[in-house]
């Protein structure tokens, strides 16, 4: 980054333009033979009234020495900058070693609050593979914002209200055969599926379910007790899965939490003349914005998701005074969030500009979609178990003497599943396939974790090294420079991931370091008889280890030291 700034400043001195603007115009050539940075001179063609090749040649002749830059070359319409490899590698690793585990962090956030809503499971429903994208993306963003100096607030907006709980009570009272605390969520799901099967032939069961939910709303002791038991059981079970994933939340305030907060929102909407009634339903007309109406109350007076989301957004702003409020929810809810944000705006809440729907593609099974009603679900717990079991077998085959095999298998197996969700742009749909998720070759989580373990192994074998004794003259080869370049690019990737709310940018940057390190490892003997060369290459290995470990952490993976 320093070389980029210095190069931009040198161009600014010759053109009179702002260095910050010029810095943004500098590109990274696709071929390293074309330089480390390239300035596209067509950007200046109009103002300078010259052809880009002429501008490039003129700048190359007029710019003098730049610290950290070995040479410049005018090539076509580009001015290419070639970094001093030795100085660049030395400066990069010194920076990483000085910052240690905080490499990639910044104080950008200044302690300001960022709300991140993710996972948002439904009570007494399966925690299935379809919940993984929201959980993994949200957890990664939570960690990324923390690393950038924000006070991230993780929110699990529980689906813990609605007529489905009336259905659950009816099913439990008809077919349940033991106290709720002794049940499993899977048993409750079977009851729920059975309710829907039976209700198709006996629709009056739906009336019975509505009556039981009304009892919950009215505070009936038996109904509320059952509802709370369903909730406690679910949170206890999913808590174990969250622990395996390394996921945490600061708030579990869900739909039920906002029941007593919606009245004030509805009153405000009415006072501001935003409500109209159509066919018995109370709504906000959004036809002027090319959107369907946002329904606030159904004809029977029941609230909807939008009503609760409005109450939740206003509560979060008052409680946390956030600078950003992120909703990590599937793209199928795009319209809902457009409507909901527009209503917030019409209410006069200018802070709605700080709210963002962080959408993502859907997860489907190779053989079909996921549905709780018909029991066609793949539990996330089963996916993690299968991944850990397969990893354990691989370890047993390749490293039977590895200490703490079970812990390593758990870290790598779970990591493989999480990484598969975070290695591509979040908007892409994912077809869940055992073969893909449990493939341990290529650009996978296990490959990144193995590279970290390889770094640790080299450093263990070497013992203590003296960074002050390093001989920087060995930093001139391409493999070494490529590794330093990948490491140096990492902090910018963390910033970009937050700017775009795209964790995959960190995953890709981490993989770049892994790939570059393995090339460096095979091209260079790290521990040699020359103490200065050994110290230099060990220092670079340590810098790679630090960067990979941080990258793995930011996307929710552990970094085993032995594999």
Predicted regions and their residues:
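Non-catalytic interaction-recognition regions
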Residues: 1-90, 98-563
